[in-house]
Amino acid sequence: MAAAMMNKSVLLNKQCGKPAAVPKVVMSKGGFARTSAVNKNRDMMVWQPFNNKMFETFSFLPPLTDEQISKQVDYILANSWTPCLEFAASDQAYAGNENCIRMGPVASTYQDNRYWTMWKLPMFGCTDGSQVLSEIQACTNAFPDAYIRLVCFDANRQVQISGFLVHRPPSATDYRLPADRQV
């Protein structure tokens, strides 16, 4: 039956005009079909639930370089979004029972109940990426042991569009390489 289903998927893919890489079906001794792709250990790993904290956009990546941050700032400004810097001490950066404001029966991990301190004012009308980068540097110099993130807002939709870390404290041990995030 599995082979018949595989043949149908090949036919459907041929009708679409796109060649499809269909995994080879292997029958085990117990009569169960398995694909060869499942044999890879990496495909079946379990997410590490402890000390695997992440922030917003790009938090699954290694810390961004200055050049990568500059490209993101250019993208933000090209879309006419308003950049804004926020910072938080290490013990206040993650959502938790100690640092969340609760309004009703809301879980402590709900992101909107956790606020970071704003660095100056949002950069309304900013058109030069170097201004944003110099503010990131000034905030980093003022608070070297804090998490600093860049968020951007769309005035038309009146929502936050993106947010990502631009600085982690040197003492931070929360970042894990992608290979270390799984058991």
From Swiss-Prot:
Q: Which domain of life is it from?
A: Eukaryota
Q: Which keywords, in A-to-Z order, does the entry hold? A: Calvin cycle, Carbon dioxide fixation, Chloroplast, Photorespiration, Photosynthesis, Plastid, Transit peptide
User: Which biological processes are named by the entry's GO terms?
Assistant: photorespiration; reductive pentose-phosphate cycle
**Short name of one Pfam family:** RuBisCO_small
Q: Does the keyword Transport apply?
A: no
What is stated as this protein's family in its record?
Answer: Belongs to the RuBisCO small chain family.
Q: What else is known?
A: The basic functional RuBisCO is composed of a large chain homodimer in a 'head-to-tail' conformation. In form I RuBisCO this homodimer is arranged in a barrel-like tetramer with the small subunits forming a tetrameric 'cap' on each end of the 'barrel'.
Q: What is this protein called?
A: Ribulose bisphosphate carboxylase small subunit, chloroplastic 5
Q: Which organism is it from?
A: Acetabularia acetabulum (Mermaid's wine glass)
Lineage of the species this protein comes from:
Eukaryota, Viridiplantae, Chlorophyta, Ulvophyceae, TCBD clade
